[in-house]
């Protein structure tokens, strides 16, 4: 099984970004959604991204942002990848000179394959837990048996992942990547370095067990 990529999302401090990178995370996520308790402004985001070591991907998370807002952020913050968590159409996600992920929230009976197909330009599809009125960061897991065997795109698994359950998630779903926020926090927006290390170790040890 190829190495599962790991993203630590909801980073609000330079020290948490560096701790995630030191633990072995492949990417960190910055939330540009004012209603989130993990939101960062342009100045803080730029400071965090500039502090990252080489080969750690910076991801910007957006929820129904306007093109003007996106352009202002992208002009100031050197993000590598965009992640859209709202009701964006494919055309809203494209044309920003960055690859993008589209997040889809899982509901029983939903045609998730059909919904994913509506974003042919996406670099990957992120599956998250559905909670009405909450675009992400719910801290709740969904039924992993609902995940299709083939979305036609790299699959990023999110939603309620923790150091205790991510190994099982990787074994069952076999995602391209996993994405965690609340599951490695001391409080909202503040990461617990020990939990970050435990999360990364749980993912990596699952791969070692299968080789």
UniProtKB/Swiss-Prot annotation:
One of its GO terms (molecular function) is phosphoribosylanthranilate isomerase activity. Pathway: Amino-acid biosynthesis; L-tryptophan biosynthesis; L-tryptophan from chorismate: step 3/5. It is an enzyme of class 5 (isomerase). Keywords: Amino-acid biosynthesis, Aromatic amino acid biosynthesis, Isomerase, Tryptophan biosynthesis. It catalyses: N-(5-phospho-beta-D-ribosyl)anthranilate = 1-(2-carboxyphenylamino)-1-deoxy-D-ribulose 5-phosphate. NCBIfam families: PRK01222.1-4, PRK01222.1-6. This is N-(5'-phosphoribosyl)anthranilate isomerase.
């Amino acid at each position: 099984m190829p190495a599962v990529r790991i993203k630590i999302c909801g980073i609000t401090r330079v020290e948490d970004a560096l701790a995630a990178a030191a633990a072995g995370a492949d990417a960190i996520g910055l939330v540009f959604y004012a209603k989130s308790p993990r939101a960062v402004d342009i100045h803080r985001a730029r400071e965090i991204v500039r502090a990252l070591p080489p080969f750690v991907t910076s991801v910007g998370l957006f929820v129904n942002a306007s093109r003007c807002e996106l352009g202002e952020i992208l002009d100031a913050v050197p993000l590598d990848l965009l992640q859209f968590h709202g009701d964006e159409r494919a055309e809203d996600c494209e044309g920003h000179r960055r690859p993008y992920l589209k997040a889809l929230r899982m509901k029983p009976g939903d045609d998730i394959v059909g919904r994913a197909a509506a974003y042919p330009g996406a670099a990957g599809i992120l599956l998250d837990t559905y909670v009405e009125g909450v675009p992400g960061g719910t801290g709740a897991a969904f039924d992993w048996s609902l995940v299709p065997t083939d979305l036609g795109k790299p699959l990023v698994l999110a939603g309620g992942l923790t150091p205790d359950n991510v190994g099982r998630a990787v074994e069952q779903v076999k995602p391209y990547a996993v994405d965690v926020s609340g599951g490695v926090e001391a409080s909202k927006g503040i990461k617990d370095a020990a939990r970050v290390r435990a999360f990364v170790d749980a993912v990596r040890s699952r791969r070692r067990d299968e080789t």
